[in-house]
């Protein structure tokens, strides 16, 4: 089994042949594990695991934001030294090297796709969402779904739509797309609008991701119809 303390991996070789001629070949690492989200918490291989994580941006300080495998590895080593067992890739998909390392080093990952949907936060960067969101979901799922470290997909982070009932359908559309491409994983989103847990937005998610206000968790857990609540951000 793939576990946090013993992240055992297998290698699968896929070969495409045309007659006797090999025309393509690919090696894929994968791990065997089960993931469950219950009202009592998160379970890996049937055992309850408390997620102790960070929101990990893709920059590497003075090394820059380009993928640097040893830089990522050192980051994860430091995180593990002070007890981290999970990472949320804020606020965009990680470099493939990050997931390879998390597979190898036993780190759980919430794989986040968007920071902006249809509504812009800064007046820019939202022009292509309607045209590209489906393809982006498909590409992310197809790229990352074989990684045992990935335990959930995150469709967004603090999007303005969480407070607009007439736009909640966008969240439902994204959740449905993730389920279509990968029915084995839950979908979450980082929410910073306190009312989003009650106004119906949370019902479009499998796991409600709460940003800050930890004092309100118990009250919201009693008030809403869904059972999965997770702290996405609690401090900066």
Question: What residue ranges belong to the model's regions?
Answer:
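A short acidic, amphipathic alpha-helical/loop segment
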Residues: 97-101, 216-223
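Conserved beta-strand edge residues that scaffold enzyme active sites
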Residues: 93-94, 116, 192-194
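Active-site neighborhood of glycoside hydrolase catalytic domains
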Residues: 132-207, 212-214, 223-224
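Secreted/periplasmic carbohydrate-active enzymes, especially glycoside hydrolases
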Residues: 1-109, 136-146, 151-152, 169-171, ...
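Beta-strand-loop-alpha-helix segment that lines the small-molecule cofactor/substrate pocket
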Residues: 108-116, 228
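Short hydrophobic/charged patches on amphipathic alpha-helices used for structural packing
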Residues: 76, 197-199, 218
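Conserved small/polar residues in nucleotide/adenosyl-binding loops
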Residues: 227-234
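The substrate-binding groove and active-site-proximal loops of carbohydrate-active enzymes
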Residues: 57-68, 82-90, 115-131, 155-166, ...
């Amino acid at each position: 089994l793939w576990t946090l303390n013993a992240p055992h991996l297998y290698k699968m070789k896929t070969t495409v042949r045309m007659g006797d001629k090999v025309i393509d070949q690919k090696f894929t690492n994968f791990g065997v594990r089960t993931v469950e989200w219950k009202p009592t918490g998160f379970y890996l291989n049937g055992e309850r695991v408390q997620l102790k994580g960070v929101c990990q941006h893709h920059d590497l300080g003075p090394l820059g934001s380009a993928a640097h495998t040893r830089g990522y590895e050192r980051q994860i080593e430091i995180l593990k030294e002070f007890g981290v067992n999970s990472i949320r890739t804020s606020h965009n998909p990680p470099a493939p090297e990050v997931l390879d390392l998390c597979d190898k080093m036993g780190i759980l990952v919430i794989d986040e796709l968007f920071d902006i949907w249809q509504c812009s936060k800064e007046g820019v960067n939202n022009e292509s969402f309607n045209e590209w969101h489906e393809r982006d979901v498909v590409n992310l799922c197809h790229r990352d779904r074989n990684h045992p470290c990935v335990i959930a997909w995150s469709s967004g982070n603090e999007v303005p739509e969480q407070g607009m009932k007439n736009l909640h359908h966008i969240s439902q559309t994204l959740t449905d797309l993730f389920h279509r491409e990968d029915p084995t994983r839950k979908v979450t989103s980082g929410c910073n609008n306190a009312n989003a847990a009650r106004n119906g937005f949370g019902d479009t998610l499998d796991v409600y991701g709460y940003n800050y206000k930890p004092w309100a968790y118990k009250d919201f857990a009693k008030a809403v119809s869904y059972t999965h609540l997770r702290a996405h951000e609690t401090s900066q």
